[in-house]
């Protein structure tokens, strides 16, 4: 029996950011040559979520995540949830993210971040899409909010219970890592 092929995937890169304006195609080409078969490009607001989808449409191996980063939470308004839902229905949208809480930079007041995070967790459940979680100095609150979300997923027999998402750029402690693994989250490590 032949061994299973390993599919290399970059689960978090912001290829639509201006940092790549001069060499984006070269970066994508080098990723292909290195054997990377899938790239997930998360949005941080509506504009970058649209850009992530556009890049995904232009490249077979690139997929998008759509979401509002906690430091962009002040951009959330009455239309944002509906616009994100529309973007999330695109066939190349594979996750809701990058979402979560950031108590280090505090680009938005904590209560605003929590409200926006909750709205996006609800959207992920509705759309059946996993989440990409940003957590900076907010471990207890992130775990508490995700506990409630995972409990709702279980109550509703959601397939997301098996793989609810990834804790991006994990900086928590061992207890949080164990908590995440017990709830089937992937843990993303910064390289």
Task: Give, region by region, the residue ranges found by the protein language model.
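Mid-domain alpha/beta scaffold segments of enzyme catalytic cores
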Residues: 1-191
């Amino acid at each position: 029996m032949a061994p299973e092929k390993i599919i290399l995937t970059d689960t978090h890169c912001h290829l639509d950011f201006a940092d790549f304006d001069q060499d984006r195609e070269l970066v994508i080409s080098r990723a292909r040559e290195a054997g990377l078969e899938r790239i997930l490009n998360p949005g941080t607001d509506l504009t970058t979520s649209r850009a992530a989808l556009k890049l995904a449409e232009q490249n077979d191996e690139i997929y998008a995540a759509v979401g509002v980063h906690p430091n962009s939470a002040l951009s959330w308004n009455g239309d944002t949830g509906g616009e994100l839902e529309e973007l999330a229905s695109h066939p190349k949208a594979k996750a809701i993210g990058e979402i979560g809480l950031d108590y280090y930079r505090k680009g938005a007041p904590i209560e605003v971040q929590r409200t926006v995070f909750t709205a996006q967790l609800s959207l992920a459940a509705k759309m059946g899409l996993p989440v990409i979680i940003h957590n900076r100095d907010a471990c207890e609150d992130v775990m508490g909010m995700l506990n409630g979300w995972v409990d709702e997923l279980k109550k509703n027999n959601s397939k997301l219970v098996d793989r609810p998402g990834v804790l991006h750029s994990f900086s928590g402690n061992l207890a949080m890592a164990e908590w995440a693994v017990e709830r089937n989250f992937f843990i993303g490590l910064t390289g």
